[in-house]
A protein has these predicted regions:
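Aromatic-rich carbohydrate-binding modules that target alpha-glucans
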Residues: 2-57, 67-128
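Short beta-strand elements bearing conserved aromatic residues within extracellular beta-rich modules
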Residues: 20-22, 62, 157
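Short, hydrophobic/aromatic-rich segments at coil-to-beta transitions
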Residues: 47, 135-145
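Short beta-strand segments enriched for Tyr within beta-sheet-rich domains
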Residues: 58-66, 159, 169, 225, ...
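Short beta-strand element of the alpha/beta-hydrolase
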Residues: 158-161, 167-178
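Cap/lid segment of the alpha/beta-hydrolase catalytic domain
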Residues: 173-242
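Alpha/beta-hydrolase fold nucleophile elbow
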Residues: 243-256
Length: 261
């Protein structure tokens, strides 16, 4: 697989860009403890490129991070047999806010951390049930504003239902709700899977993180957050869309900090 990026400022004679870091899910990202990879400029052109091998089944996202610096990462990242994990994470943490999506890739959005990403899948990537029917009709979700007395803040919450109204419907809580509501709307996928009988009719609650600071504070194992959800939010949701109180009929889904939650 070859990645290409064109420097808007032109060649090395007119541009200040020294690196174009490539952040690829599961390949060069901070979870892999892999040395950072930069595209290389083709001399005397505005073209940068990087080539790597990918599994035929791979699917994920990627982004470019142009930089005017040669040394965005500490030297410990490039020394020894393995990069220093903490130094690697710190380097990516500083760089990711400056990430850009691929301007030639129409399938681009803002990822869960708020930075731009683009989609990529190899020819043998497995089918994604539900997502392969984007035109499935669905009932429009309701967006409310939750004012939390315990957390002393307010945020958006989306309530989405499938099937007929019933107090026995399961409950699914999706963290990073703004991502699944706006960046990558999950509604048609859930509706499709429900229509096919692969998911039961359910009540879905998508909780906004407000911003990255609140996400970092509230999601990783924060009992106050969950007490607020349980005591404040869910009773409000239940008055609008009845659902079952049974633990075995309840799902909480999240990724990264949401997974820790």
């Amino acid at each position: 697989m070859t990645f290409w990026w064109r420097d808007p400022a032109g060649t090395q004679k007119t541009s200040t860009i020294k690196r174009v870091w490539l952040y690829v899910t599961g390949v060069t990202d901070h979870h892999q403890n892999a040395r950072p990879q930069s595209l290389e400029r083709i001399p005397d052109t505005d073209v940068w490129q990087w080539q790597g091998e990918f599994s035929p089944e791979w699917r994920g996202s990627y982004c470019f991070i142009p930089s005017d610096n040669e040394d965005d990462f500490a030297s410990a990242v490039f020394e020894g047999e393995q990069p220093d994990r903490m130094a690697l994470r710190e380097g990516w943490r500083k760089l990711l806010p400056h990430a850009v999506s691929d301007p030639l890739n129409a399938q681009s959005w803002r990822g869960g951390r708020g930075h731009a990403v683009s989609a990529l899948e190899m020819p043998e990537a497995p089918v994604q049930p539900g997502w392969n029917h984007p035109d499935t009709p669905y009932k429009k979700p309701v967006c409310i504003e939750w004012h939390s007395a315990r957390l002393k803040n307010r945020r958006r919450v989306w309530i989405f239902t499938t099937g007929d109204e019933s107090p026995e419907r399961p409950l699914a809580v999706l963290l990073d709700g703004q991502f699944w509501a706006e960046s990558m709307p999950v509604w048609p996928a859930l509706a499709s899977l429900t229509h096919e009988g692969k998911l039961p009719p359910a009540v879905y609650v998508l909780i906004d993180v407000i911003d990255t600071a609140h996400r970092s504070r509230e999601l990783p194992c924060n009992p106050d957050f969950w007490l607020a959800v349980q005591d404040e939010l869910l009773p409000q949701v239940k008055s609008m869309a009845p659902f079952s109180d049974r633990a075995d009929h309840t799902v909480v889904a999240g990724q990264s900090f949401g997974g820790l939650s």
